[in-house]
Amino acid sequence: IRILDNSYISNTQFISLAEEVAEKCGVKYQESVRRGGSTNAAKISVTGKAVPCLVLGVPSRYAHSHYNFCAKEDLEAASAMAANVIRALDEEKIRHICHQDVL
């Protein structure tokens, strides 16, 4: 779970939800703070209706090369995390994450 990178500070409510879901479902995760690099989350979070984003990353070696290596278990955990967080979202949780009464 990316907490912060070069261009985006993650929504703390979304992070809390992801951590709750991971604990409940037994999905292993780590928190990450990056001083360099970024994702599209910064742009997405301020586009249109300012959509909160949750950045899930997979630890890997030789990123952005032809030989990017990662553990199969980490890919499976990231997929499980994403699927379970999506399943956990309902209107009430989305409002809580967005801090607004009407979507």
Place the predicted regions along the sequence by residue.
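Active-site-adjacent substrate-binding region
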Residues: 1-76, 85-89, 93-103
